[in-house]
Curated annotation (Swiss-Prot):
Domain Toprim: 80-175
One of the record's GO molecular function terms: DNA binding
Source organism: Carboxydothermus hydrogenoformans (strain ATCC BAA-161 / DSM 6008 / Z-2901)
UniProt signal peptide: none
Chain ranges of zinc fingers (C4-type): 57-72
Protein's recorded name: Recombination protein RecR
Superkingdom field: Bacteria
Key words of the record: DNA damage, DNA recombination, DNA repair, Metal-binding, Zinc, Zinc-finger
Gene (name only): recR
The keyword DNA repair is assigned to this record: yes
Function as written in the Swiss-Prot or TrEMBL entry: May play a role in DNA repair. It seems to be involved in an RecBC-independent recombinational process of DNA repair. It may act with RecF and RecO.
SUPFAM superfamilies given in the database record: Recombination protein RecR
């Protein structure tokens, strides 16, 4: 199907978004062209504002508009309990459950030798530095139940256990090969409750 160049360019950019294929990009582009101009401007402004005003927390590396983030600076959180997650979206998924009152550390990925991602490409060094300064007692490793997620969990456990931390792994109420982000609140809560000590 032929589209004018500006529309084709919009479709091309939308198709670069995760989970958006060419047909969905086309559908979204046509929808965006149909909405009132003020709605389109508001969407564009929201994207620009989010890009401009969002940064990574200097403590946990979660997305935030303040530094440190609201979770890290909250004295009501249990700062002795730290959950390590792959991505910022995993923090959002955990927070949705309302069942975790500790703090987080976002790795920004997982180990993947095939993709050339090693520990130096993740926030592992920052995690170790943080643990030397904070009163953390238990570390919950909440990487996704994928091959890379498991490898990352085992690597972290091998680093952290000699440092005398209690290191646990969330239970696998989560289906193997899936992402935490897509799990419902009950599944995440059960996985959190059933965490186990990593040997």
């Amino acid at each position: 199907m032929y589209f004018a160049e500006p529309v084709a360019k919009l479709i091309e950019h939308l198709a670069k978004l995760p989970g958006i294929g060419p047909k969905t990009a086309q559908k979204l582009a046509l929808y965006l062209l149909e909405i009132p101009e003020e709605e389109a401007r508001a969407l564009a402004e929201a994207i620009i504002t989010a890009r401009k005003n969002t940064r990574y927390c200097s403590i946990c590396f979660n997305l935030t508009d303040t530094d440190p983030c609201a979770i890290c600076r909250n004295p009501g959180r249990n700062h002795r309990l730290l959950m390590v997650v792959e991505e910022a979206k995993d923090v959002a998924a955990m927070e949705r459950t309302g069942s975790f009152n500790g703090i987080y550390h976002v790795l920004h990925g997982v180990l993947s030798p095939i993709k050339g991602i090693g520990p130096e490409d993740l926030k592992v060094r920052e995690l170790l530095l943080r643990l030397s300064r904070e009163p953390v007692e238990e570390i919950i490793i909440a990487t996704n139940p994928t091959v890379e997620g498991e490898a990352t969990a085992m690597y972290l456990a091998s680093l952290l256990k000699p440092l005398n931390f209690k290191v646990t792994r969330i239970a696998h109420g989560l289906p193997v090969g899936s992402d935490i982000e897509y799990a419902d609140e009950l599944t995440i809560r059960k996985a959190l409750e059933g965490r186990r000590v990593l040997e």
